[in-house]
Structure formats: structure tokens, C-alpha cells
């Protein structure tokens, strides 16, 4: 097993910055040692939003953005390494998810695209990188997402308590950790994404701090019911989605027959949509004794309060209470997935993604001279 220090890098669907964590990882332990959040320049955020909403761009523009994101991720890693006085040889590898700009897991040619050139990260940090985590799972018939439930299982499963982990980023996803049962997980639908898109267009703010704007409005029930009829919400798991589906254009289509609504009422309705779709999926999945929240949505007290109200038989808490800072969860997960890759261990869960089999996932971009460490030797497939 490739035990040692790993760095995880995550730039999620909320586009609120780059999260970077440092952790010591071995077969039995994931010990977070440091973290930081690195700002995302507004022009890069805008370019990503444009792609995700289907605006055309040239291959040159895509290549430039891929380069810029790789440099941005490297800057974030170098800042953490400088803060912790680390040399490249002190770090086994960087696990970098990349920035998802398109995710289309169904149809005749399922595909997903994460950008942020891993070669730039290697060249600028001197540390080997593991990236491109999702496409192996898709090649095996899976959704390529979510991948974090495997990490939730390793850290947060309980021998007797029915638990769920809820990550509320741009998209919300659930991990079902039930004793004696295979782990399940799926995207419930929008997390912060639609609320962020609406307040950005209406007020020029990146997010609704503490849900205060939503709290000033009233839920428009006919609009909420129209939103809930979107076919994604009735699609059975395994399922996954992203900004290419739930975006500002989606809001505009829902509002087409609701002209003149107060903007704060739309925001209140979007918050209720997130809360109600999550709560419904918790209940349809059999319920949980404890729902542990991570991600940026966990800092929205209005949203958390609505979830608690909709789930009266469930203890709603934060992963912070379990010793894992919610804002760092996904970056920490990709540090762990990098460890799994270099150790030749599967990183996906077929019970979550629908893949035909568990597999080593991710591509390795080695540093030169490999950080004075050898790359993993993967076990031969059965029967070979």
C-alpha cells in the first residue's frame, strides 16, 4: 500500500473556489493535516459557466481554459505546500478531480469531461498527480458518479446505525451507509446551484448568505410543483447530473408561465426545491437515523432547518461533528482516491455507479524523477 502524505484538489459545481487538503493516509487511517481555499478568478468562473450552459466555444478557447485551470490548481497546491513547508518529495501524490464542464452519463455515447491540465500541475509542483477519475467507471457501464460514497463508507459507516451522508455542493448527493447492505449513492438534484444562479443574475451576489434572501420570500407552490415534475427527480438510481442540466436556463423554462413573481419568492421556492427533493429521496431510500451534511450548503442555516423540519425522525448534523470539516470532504476524498489508485485498489462502487465491476480508477501523471518513489504495480486481472 502506498501510505504517506497526499494532497487532494477539488473545484466543484458551485465554482466558489479551489479546495486543497493535505492528509496522511494509510490502509487504516485518513488524518487531515491542513487545508486552504484558493479563489477562482471571475473570468475563469464565467468561462466555465458559459460552457456548462451550452454556449459554443472554439477548441482554442477550451484548450486555453484547460491550461489556465491546470495553472490555477498548481498555484493552490503550491500555496498549501509553502504554508506547510513541504518539499515535493514529502508528498506521495496529488489527487485532482479537475473541473467538470460536461457530464452526460446516458445515451449512445456516455461521457464526462473534467478539465485542468494535470501535466501543468506536475510541472509546476514537482509532485505526481492522479486525475481523470470518472471515465474508467463510465467505460465499465457506470455513471462515473458519485465517487465520494466509497470514501464516506471508509470513514463514516457505523456497525449498527443507519446513516446517510449528504453533500450539498452545486449538486446534492446522498451516500446510503446501512449496516449489512451495499453502499448506495446518487445525485438527488440541485444543491446550491439554482439558488446561486438566481441570486447572481438578480443581485450580482455569488450566493445567498445564510439563506437570508430566501427567508425574505414565500414559496410559490404552483411553481414548486412544476419544478418537481422534472423527469430527473423520478428517475431511479443510479443517476447523476450536473450544471449542464440544472442551470439558469432551467430556471427560465420553469418560470415561462409565472411572469412577474417577486425575485425573493423565486429564491424561496428554489431553496424549498433543494430541501424537498433531498428529503423525499431520504425517505424513499428507507430513511436514516442520522443525516450528516457536508459541502457549502451545510453553512446555509435556512436550508438545514428546512431539511430538519422535513425529516422529523432523523438526527440532522454536520460531518464537522464527526471530525471531518464539511468544506474539505470532497478534496479529502480525492486525496484518498489517489491513494487507492497508487495502491492498485478499486476506487468506484458498482452498487453506487452501476458499473459492471469495481476497478482501479484514475490516470497517473508521474513527476520526474517520480518523487524518488516507484509507481504502483497493479495486480493482474483474474484468470490472466
From Swiss-Prot:
For the biological process aspect of GO, one term held by this record is:
amino sugar metabolic process
Q: What is its EC number?
A: 2.7.1.170
Keywords, ordered alphabetically? ATP-binding, Carbohydrate metabolism, Kinase, Nucleotide-binding, Transferase
Highest taxon of source: Bacteria
The record's listing under SUPFAM superfamilies reads:
Actin-like ATPase domain
GO MF entry, a single one: phosphotransferase activity, alcohol group as acceptor
Signal sequence: where?
none
Is-annotated flag, keyword Mitochondrion?
A: no
A Pfam family that this protein carries is AnmK
Where along the chain is ATP bound? 12-19
Metabolic or biological pathway, per its Swiss-Prot or TrEMBL entry: Amino-sugar metabolism; 1,6-anhydro-N-acetylmuramate degradation; Cell wall biogenesis; peptidoglycan recycling
> What catalytic activity does the UniProt entry give for this protein?
1,6-anhydro-N-acetyl-beta-muramate + ATP + H2O = N-acetyl-D-muramate 6-phosphate + ADP + H(+)
Note the Gene3D superfamilies from the entry: 3.30.420.40
| Principal EC category | transferase
NCBIfam families from the entry? PRK09585.1-1, PRK09585.1-3, PRK09585.3-2
Question: PANTHER family per the record?
Answer: ANHYDRO-N-ACETYLMURAMIC ACID KINASE
The role this protein plays is: Catalyzes the specific phosphorylation of 1,6-anhydro-N-acetylmuramic acid (anhMurNAc) with the simultaneous cleavage of the 1,6-anhydro ring, generating MurNAc-6-P. Is required for the utilization of anhMurNAc either imported from the medium or derived from its own cell wall murein, and thus plays a role in cell wall recycling.
Q: What does the sequence similarity comment in the record state about its family?
A: Belongs to the anhydro-N-acetylmuramic acid kinase family.
Q: What is this protein called?
A: Anhydro-N-acetylmuramic acid kinase
**Which gene underlies this protein?**
anmK
Amino acid at each position: 500500500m502506498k501510505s504517506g502524505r497526499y494532497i487532494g484538489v477539488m473545484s466543484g459545481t458551485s465554482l466558489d473556489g479551489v479546495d486543497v487538503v493535505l492528509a496522511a493516509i494509510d490502509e487504516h487511517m485518513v488524518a487531515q493535516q491542513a487545508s486552504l481555499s484558493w479563489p477562482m478568478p471571475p473570468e475563469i468562473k464565467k468561462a466555465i459557466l458559459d460552457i456548462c450552459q451550452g454556449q459554443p466555444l472554439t477548441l482554442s478557447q477550451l484548450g486555453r481554459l484547460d491550461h489556465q485551470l491546470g495553472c490555477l490548481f498548481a498555484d493552490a497546491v503550491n500555496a498549501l505546500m509553502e504554508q506547510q513547508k513541504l518539499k515535493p518529495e514529502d508528498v506521495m501524490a496529488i489527487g485532482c478531480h479537475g473541473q467538470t464542464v460536461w457530464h452526460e452519463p446516458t445515451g449512445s455515447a456516455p461521457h464526462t469531461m473534467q478539465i485542468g491540465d494535470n501535466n501543468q500541475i506536475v510541472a509546476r509542483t514537482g509532485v505526481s498527480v492522479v486525475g481523470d477519475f470518472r471515465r474508467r467507471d463510465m467505460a465499465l457501464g457506470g455513471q462515473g458518479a458519485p465517487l465520494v460514497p466509497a470514501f464516506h463508507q471508509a470513514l463514516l459507516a457505523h456497525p449498527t446505525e443507519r446513516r446517510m451522508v449528504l453533500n450539498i455542493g452545486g449538486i446534492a448527493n446522498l451516500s446510503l451507509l446501512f449496516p449489512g447492505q451495499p453502499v448506495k449513492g446518487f445525485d438527488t438534484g440541485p444543491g446550491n446551484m439554482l439558488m446561486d444562479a438566481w441570486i447572481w443574475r438578480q443581485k450580482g451576489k455569488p450566493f445567498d448568505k445564510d439563506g437570508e434572501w430566501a427567508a425574505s420570500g414565500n414559496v410559490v407552490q404552483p411553481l414548486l410543483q412544476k419544478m418537481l415534475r422534472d423527469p430527473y427527480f423520478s428517475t431511479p438510481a443510479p443517476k447523476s447530473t450536473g450544471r449542464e442540466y440544472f442551470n439558469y436556463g432551467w430556471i427560465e423554462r420553469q418560470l415561462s408561465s409565472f411572469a412577474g413573481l417577486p425575485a425573493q419568492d423565486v429564491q424561496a421556492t428554489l431553496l424549498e426545491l433543494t430541501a424537498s427533493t433531498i428529503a423525499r429521496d431520504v425517505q424513499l431510500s428507507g430513511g436514516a437515523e442520522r443525516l450528516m451534511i457536508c459541502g457549502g450548503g451545510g453553512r446555509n442555516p435556512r436550508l438545514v432547518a428546512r431539511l430538519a423540519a422535513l425529516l422529523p425522525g432523523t438526527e440532522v448534523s454536520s460531518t464537522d461533528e464527526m471530525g471531518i470539516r464539511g468544506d474539505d470532504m470532497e478534496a479529502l476524498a480525492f486525496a484518498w482516491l489517489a491513494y487507492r489508485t497508487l495502491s492498485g485498489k478499486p476506487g468506484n462502487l458498482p452498487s453506487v455507479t452501476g458499473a459492471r465491476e469495481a476497478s482501479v480508477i484514475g490516470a497517473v501523471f508521474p513527476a520526474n524523477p517520480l518523487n524518488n518513489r516507484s509507481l504502483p504495480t497493479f495486480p493482474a486481472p483474474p484468470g490472466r
